[in-house]
Amino acid sequence: MRTEFLWGVLALLCQQTLVSGHILGRPSSANDLAQLKSLLERFEETLDEVVQKEDLEAYYEDMNQDPKSSQTSQGWDQEGNQEPLISEKAQPLTEGKTVNQRSRLQDLLMATRKRTSGCFGARMDRIGNASGLGCNSGRG
């Protein structure tokens, strides 16, 4: 009975040492809390700055994707107005083509290229043997 009591006291003493040694077990001073609060405020400010920068970048990218508002397309339009090379009757037909070509070029530039192998997945049957699901072997 006495040994059980000693083991119990030893276990409680170890537990007390572990709890008091942990940072959450210590009493916090007002200075520590103030420092944590200021750190949190600075973190929130930097997050706000990052969000604002991302919003500006997204806005800038959206403005550049619009062919009517981009500076390069305005410059091209001004050059086209200064030097008419095509007769006025053929111009409406070619304007549609240039707008179409310009939009296709912008789509090519803005599109994210995906490298596909023609397979939408692969399945492992056994170790070392892989069978492709949905693979087009003719297109490879």
From Swiss-Prot:
Disulfide bonds join C119-C135. One of its GO terms (biological process) is receptor guanylyl cyclase signaling pathway. The record marks R113, K114 as: Cleavage. One of its GO terms (molecular function) is hormone activity. SMART domains: NAT_PEP. Keywords: Cleavage on pair of basic residues, Disulfide bond, Hormone, Secreted, Signal, Vasoactive. Residues 59-102 are annotated as: Disordered. Cleaved upon secretion to produce the functional hormone. Pfam families: ANP. It is found in: Secreted. GO terms for cellular component: cytoplasm; extracellular space. Residues 1-21 form the signal peptide. The keyword Repressor does not apply. Belongs to the natriuretic peptide family. This is Natriuretic peptides A.
